[in-house]
Structures are given as C-alpha cells and as structure tokens.
Curated annotation (Swiss-Prot):
Pfam families: EKLF_TAD1, EKLF_TAD2, zf-C2H2. A zinc finger (C2H2-type) spans 275-299, 305-329, 335-357. The keyword Phosphoprotein applies. This is Krueppel-like factor 1. The gene is Klf1.
Length: 358
C-alpha cells in the first residue's frame, strides 16, 4: 500500500485532470475550424506571395450541426485562464478569410503564448504535431542598401572621346595608337600628366636608324623638349617628330620645308655633232659617221641593200629598211598588241594601233 500511495495520484488530482481534458477537446474544436486563417511566421515578404495555411476540420459531419458558427472564444478570457509568456514585438492580427460565416478577428497564436516551450494548455495535445507556422518569427536580416556611386566633381565628369584616327594618333586629348585601353587626357592637362602611364609599345627608333645609316649625328631643330612633354604626347607623335627632324637635318632644311625633287633619269653629256653633210643646200650634222653615210645615199641615190626574195628587185639605202621589207615576204610580225590579238611587222604600226585603245 505504501508503494501504491507513492505511485498513484489522488482522486482530486484525477478529477481536475478530467476537466482539463474536456477543456483541451473544446479548444481543439475551436482551433481546427473550417475557416482559412493567415498563420504566417512573420511579416509578409514583399518579394513573395503570402503564406496561407488551410486547416480543415477532422470532426465528423454530425458535429457540424451542433457547432454554432456565430460563437467565438473571448480572447481576454482565454488569456486569463491560460497565461503564457508573450514575446515582445509579435502583436499582429490574424484575419479569417472571407467565407459563409461572419468575419471575426483573433489574436495570432504567437500572442496567445509560447506553445512550443512555455507552460500552456496547447503544449500537451498539440506538441506532437509540427506546425512551422506556430513557431516564433525569426528576425529577418536587413536588406543591403543599394550602392550609390559618389557624385563626381563638375570638372571630373568623363567626356566622350572620338574614335582613333591616323591624324590624331598620339595627340594630346586623344588616344594612344594601337591600344586596347584608351587613356584620354584632359585638354588643359599640364605636362607630365600622363607620364605615369607606361608606353603601350616601344616607339620606332627613327633617330637611331638615321644615325647608323648615314653615320651622322641627328641634329635637333630648336630646343630639346622635356621628357614629361614627350610622354604626354605619346609614342606615335614622338617617333614621327624625331623622323622628320632627322630627315630635315640631313637635307639642311627646316622641318616645314620639303626637300627638292630629283629626277630619276640622269642626263648624259650631249655628243658634239662632228660629222656634217657637204652637199649643197644641206647642212645636217651627225655624231656618227655611219649615220652621215646613210644620209649621203639619199643625195647620191645609192641603194646597196637589195632584196633576195625570188622575183623581187627592191633595193634600199639602209639595212633596217631592207629588214622591214623582207618581213612582208615571210609574214613575220614580231610586234603584238597586248590588248587584242593583232600583230604588226613594224613598231611604228603598233604604236599607231595602240592609240585606238586609248
């Protein structure tokens, strides 16, 4: 008996427990209603849809007639009979979805008590069911503020630069030639502003080339520009100026003066006409004696060059005339037109024909 008294509870305790179970059953009937309630764990997410949990009653259809849809529990009475630890900052209203019954507002389950861990009525019968919507809302981390670039000063606003051209290659305010990254310079930038940027490619050494080729020191026209100014101009402009200075220095002219043009044909000294025709009324002179002999044949009528073709008695004073005549018999035409298939036996005939193609 002593062991039974220590194990079994008293009759008064069992009586109180029976009333407690009846109250739990009534609470479950009220809680599991056919209405759709918004039991979201926290404030609605602006980027996503609101969470709605539809709880359907598991009571048999016979008990629906006994329930009064107009009755509702008094929240003050419920909080008085079943106190619980209320977490601060969770006072929110839970509105029933529109249905056939009247619309009423109740306190959310978070304001009725901490059902998951605090002492309350719902801990026992509802503790076995895992409802994520009854848990306390977890604090949401603050959203990162959008990045706002600092306002630029009025003088530092970037300006659109024109595309690269040969005429502006390496000039101040333009772009470096043959470069993937454009480094524009301000129009009023002082000398040496771009000296920190390395050369994108080695500049052609025109000055050294002229020194090695001619064996002379390249003279400088005027004063020497400072290195910072050369870096600001860019490699293309520096190389061009050095090359122009070297060429002008070798010619003894200023950089702006073009060197005089030289003819490719060298004029040979003119031969003196030492051979003069002695026929009366003819004073022609020739540099060669053979030319004078051919000319005298026109006065004397001598024709030493006769045609050897059978049946041809033509005779000529010059050998080249006999050669052209002989081509008439053979049909040889060495002078061909490059624009058409025609050919000629004489060069002067080909020259006249080429004028027709012009």
């Amino acid at each position: 008996m002593a062991s039974a008294e220590t194990v079994l509870p008293s009759i008064s305790t069992l009586t109180t427990l029976g009333q407690f179970l009846d109250t739990q059953e009534d609470f479950l009937k009220w809680w599991r209603s056919e209405e759709t309630q918004d039991l979201g764990p926290g404030p609605p997410n602006p980027t996503g849809p609101s969470l709605h949990v539809s709880l359907k009653s598991e009571d048999p259809s016979g008990e629906d007639d006994e329930r009064d849809v107009t009755c509702a529990w008094d929240p003050d009475l419920f909080l008085t009979n079943f106190p619980g630890s209320e977490s601060p900052g969770t006072s929110r209203t839970c509105a029933l979805a529109p249905s056939v019954g009247p619309v009423a507002q109740f306190e959310p389950p978070e304001s009725l008590g901490a059902y998951a861990g605090g002492p309350g009525l719902v801990t026992g019968p509802l503790g076995s069911e895992e409802h994520t919507s009854w848990a306390h809302p977890t604090p949401r981390p603050p959203a990162p503020e959008p990045f706002v670039a600092p306002a630029l000063a009025p003088g530092l606003a970037p300006k659109a630069q024109p595309s690269y051209s040969d005429s502006r290659a390496g000039s101040v305010g333009g772009f470096f030639p043959r470069a993937g990254l454009a480094v524009p310079a301000a129009p009023g930038a002082p000398y040496g502003l771009l000296s920190g940027y390395p050369a994108l490619y080695p500049a052609p050494q025109y000055q050294g080339h002229f020194q090695l080729f001619r064996g002379l020191a390249a003279p400088s026209a005027g004063g020497t520009a400072p290195p910072s100014f050369l870096n600001c101009l860019g490699p293309g402009t520096v190389a061009t100026e050095l090359g122009a200075t070297a060429i002008a220095g070798d010619a003894g002219l200023s950089p702006g003066t073009a060197p005089p043009k030289r003819s490719r044909r060298t004029l040979a000294p003119k031969r003196q006409a030492a051979h003069t025709c002695g026929h009366e009324g003819c004073g022609k002179s020739y540099s060669k004696s053979s030319h004078l002999k051919a000319h005298l044949r026109t006065h004397t009528g001598e024709k030493p060059y006769a045609c050897s073709w059978d049946g041809c008695d033509w005779r000529f004073a010059r050998s080249d005339e006999l050669t052209r005549h002989y081509r008439k018999h053979t049909g040889h035409r060495p002078f061909c037109c490059g624009l058409c298939p025609r050919a000629f036996s004489r060069s002067d005939h080909l020259a006249l024909h080429m004028k027709r193609h012009l």
